[in-house]
Design a protein with these regions (language model features):
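Aromatic "clamp/platform" in nucleotide-sugar-dependent glycosyltransferases that forms part
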Residues: 281
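Glycosyltransferase donor-sugar binding loop
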Residues: 42-48, 183, 204, 229-246
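Donor nucleotide-sugar binding/catalytic pocket of nucleotide-sugar-dependent glycosyltransferases
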Residues: 60-61, 144, 148-189
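Short hydrophobic beta-strand element within catalytic cores of glycosyltransferases
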Residues: 298-301
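A conserved mid-protein helix/loop that constitutes part of the nucleotide-sugar donor-binding site
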Residues: 24-29, 203, 208-222, 290
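Short His-centered aromatic/hydrophobic patch
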Residues: 93-99, 119-120
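Nucleotide-activated donor-binding/catalytic signature segment of Leloir-type glycosyltransferases, i.e.
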Residues: 244-263
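Conserved acidic donor-binding segment of nucleotide-sugar-dependent glycosyltransferases
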Residues: 313, 317-325, 333-338
Length: 374
């Protein structure tokens, strides 16, 4: 029988995504905390390729066009990459789109690899967009037939996504619930001073319609108080059909009621703000909400399955259906909420015990070791 030590020596893990951002921004800390050091990345080359090469043992360029709904050449390239892997390799796909592309390529893979899929929110495919609904209908039969063969285990971030997807897909393999990707606690500058006047409100997100960027712009028009400043941080996602356009962004830049500040270093800069707004319509487990809580901001979030856990904490307020009047009322009457440094410290203790990168990485380790021994 193989010992745990032997398993770790033999174990090869590959992280797969159709976007380099996924394997850097949300996974780099997990990789650095895993017991197994033999981890490769497969994703298209992009602005984070240089960083990926310093974190993963090897980076393999997946030649795929993110802007296409289905890139046949990209699937063929992935098939060739998968066939080059050693038998027994664990291929961990991140996002539902990547999982679908992997399942297509896997139909033509000859070696015995073990698939794992992390569904970090159901995303575009399960949105109310007409094209998305049509695409979901077309893919339903394929997903039902292929996912049980392609994936030994599927990881969800909340119960609602799990129930919806299992009903849709008929998946019958192993299932795990891991809440988020965790945060590396020592990387963050904590907020030390708290104020109730001259507030700085910030919305940090990819600039997607479903993330609520247009709702946020409407909110800034609702509150005309010289003591409240609004900031928008994030970038257009050209490979996402739900992204705002460059023309939309130029209009935002010309607005007087909100300041667009581009991409920010959340770990080092977010402490400068007072209130974090999350207006997403769909979310697996909101990372920016977790980061905002740990840093010490007051958080106002749309009440969806991926943010509902905010109820555990002191410094948060959930609103229904992004109700602008409810959000405006909280901001305008912020003094009444009495949020303090002591509340922030209490929240940090919860995060240390439940949501740190180390906690999440241990759950990943358990999954990989179980797969290696099966």
């Amino acid at each position: 029988m193989l010992t745990i030590l032997t398993l770790k020596i033999l174990l090869m893990i590959v992280y797969l995504s159709h976007w380099d951002w996924n394997l850097y921004k949300s996974r780099k800390d997990i990789v650095l905390n895993l017991d197994e050091l033999n981890i490769k990345s497969i994703c298209p080359e992009g602005i984070y390729t240089k960083e990926l090469k310093t974190i993963y043992q090897e980076h393999i360029n997946w030649k795929i066009d993110r802007e296409k709904t289905f890139d046949l050449k990209g699937v063929i390239n992935l098939k060739n990459i998968l066939n080059s892997l050693e038998g027994g390799t664990i291929v961990h796909s991140f996002t539902l789109k990547t999982g679908i592309l992997y399942s297509v390529a896997n139909l033509f893979v000859n070696n015995r690899i073990k698939g794992v899929l992390s569904i970090n929110g159901l995303g575009y495919l399960f949105s109310n967009n007409f094209k998305a609904k049509l695409l979901k209908l077309l893919l339903k039969t394929f997903i039902k037939k292929s996912f049980n063969k392609s994936f030994k285990e599927i990881i969800f971030q909340n119960e609602s996504d799990k129930e919806i997807f299992l009903k849709f897909s008929g998946y019958s393999g192993r299932i795990s619930l891991i809440k988020g990707s965790g945060i590396e606690l020592n990387n963050y500058i904590k907020k030390e001073t708290y104020q109730t006047e001259k507030l700085k409100v910030i919305f940090v997100s990819r600039l997607l319609i479903d993330k609520g960027v247009n709702n946020y712009i409407e909110l800034t028009k609702n509150i005309l108080d010289s003591n409240i400043d609004f900031y928008l941080a994030g970038e257009i996602d050209d490979g996402n059909p739900n992204s705002i356009t460059q023309k939309d962004l130029e209009k935002i830049k010309n607005l007087d009621n909100v300041k667009y500040i581009g991409s920010i270093n959340v770990e080092k800069e977010l402490f400068n703000y007072d209130i974090s707004i999350i207006m997403s319509k769909y979310e697996g487990f909101s990372r920016i909400l977790l980061e905002s809580l740990y840093i010490g901001l007051f958080c106002i979030s749309n009440n969806i399955p991926g943010t509902r856990w905010l109820k555990e904490f002191n410094n948060g307020f959930l609103v229904e259906n992004n109700n602008l009047n409810s959000i405006s009322k909280v901001i305008n009457n912020f003094k009444e909420y009495g949020f303090s440094k002591a509340d922030a410290e209490s929240n940090r203790e919860i995060i240390k015990k439940k949501y740190s990168t180390k906690i999440i990485s241990n759950q990943y380790n358990e999954i990989y070791n179980n797969l290696a021994s099966s």
